[in-house]
Amino acid sequence: MSIKTSNTDFKTRIRQQIEDPIMRKAVANAQQRIGANRQKMVDELGHWEEWRDRAAQIRDHVLSNLDAYLYQLSEKVTQNGGHVYFARTKEDATRYILQVAQRKNARKVVKSKSMVTEEIGVNHVLQDAGIQVIETDLGEYILQLDQDPPSHVVVPAIHKDRHQIRRVLHERLGYEGPETPEAMTLFIRQKIREDFLSAEIGITGCNFAVAETGSVCLVTNEGNARMCTTLPKTHIAVMGMERIAPTFAEVDVLITMLARSAVGARLTGYNTWLTGPREAGHVDGPEEFHLVIVDNGRSEVLASEFRDVLRCIRCGACMNTCPAYRHIGGHGYGSIYPGPIGAVISPLLGGYKDFKDLPYACSLCTACDNVCPVRIPLSKLILRHRRVMAEKGITAKAEQRAIKMFAYANSHPGLWKVGMMAGAHAASWFINGGKTPLKFGAISDWMEARDLPEADGESFRSWFKKHQAQEKKNG
């Protein structure tokens, strides 16, 4: 499995999402609620722009010294009694995780929410080997039951309302209780606790790894990650190679930004720090700890003009403010990484063949630039993708032909002049009362809702020449 979540073509996906009123209402409500809470926390903290500057500096410093910090982290984890595996590709990562599971004769694995494990497709690899995988994040658990991919990096089931969730629980687990969040959460919690107690392995992601101590930081709202790391005898943490902080001082800044940007809170419900396996005399924690550090294309991104995207701390703030995401939801992007960050990172990790449309799923309003806690210039990176695709000839054939025609006309003044005159006359014929009977594909609806400027059949060149002559005459 790749980061691709749908084989449906982009235009069809967009149409399906726009025609889904439940999804659009759910996403709009979530954006409004999270956005309002975020603003309260930003105002409360104060000096927000300075905090953003500091967070961006920390992430830039790590990326510029990534080799040194990866080495330091590896040494510390090993000293703490853990095992470190550097995975160049997603296949390397899943192969190692499967080997650990098979060596432990694991029949069941419990997982906390992790984007990088979604990225490498670890669930499918383990399930194909006959190992049961249980997602323990509330949203991910519901989506797993419904065989539905996540649509947000923080709130995976943002596109579902409680009526749909109850239907899933009823059809998959026989739930007969009321349609209240409290009752449904209690029902799921009771189900998952049985899995926590019987699983041989717990798999988590890693929000940040501390190079100085070899510690892994897990940030959750439900506490399920603590259960995944304390009850099973083996804990496997999977992290993208860029998710490092030098010391706890830097993590303090990043967590401050993460919680406020992700859900509009001072802190998330649970912040868990893990430093190696259980020590002698301790009553909980895993007997064995593995840290899988995943590259999967990140080295190439680091060496490219898109390296700034690796600052990302997966807060989802860009999705929570994006007008395009509001209308098409996460599934419209066809990637586990949706929204503005997905429009940048999906083509880098998954290739332009599958994700060439995503850089165009953006109005370039720059709202994402203004909320990103680590100052990733997302709109500039999206434009950069468009430029790269144009240079590589990946854009639509019709667009390529139009650009060639424009370039040819622009380099032949006589032809350009004739074209401008013809266009001016055509505009005067087809625009009446601010409307035109012509249809222009995707922008037809946009044009119907707006009054077009009246045209008098005169090109700007001829108008300018006429007025210039008049000024000289009056001069």
From Swiss-Prot:
Gene for this chain: ykgF
Top-level lineage group: Bacteria
A family per Pfam: Fer4_8
Keywords of the record: 4Fe-4S, Electron transport, Iron, Iron-sulfur, Metal-binding, Repeat, Transport
Residues at which [4Fe-4S] cluster 2 binds: C322, C362, C365, C368
The organism of origin for this protein: Escherichia coli (strain K12)
Family as reported in the entry's similarity comment: Belongs to the LutB/YkgF family.
Protein name: Uncharacterized electron transport protein YkgF
Lineage: Bacteria, Pseudomonadati, Pseudomonadota, Gammaproteobacteria, Enterobacterales
Other observations noted: The E.coli ykgEFG operon is a clear homolog of the B.subtilis lutABC operon, however it is not able of restoring L-lactate utilization to the B.subtilis mutant for lutABC operon. Thus, ykgEFG operon may contribute to lactate catabolism in E.coli, but under conditions other than those tested, or alternatively, the ykgEFG operon may be responsible for the catabolism of a metabolite other than (but perhaps related to) lactate in E.coli.
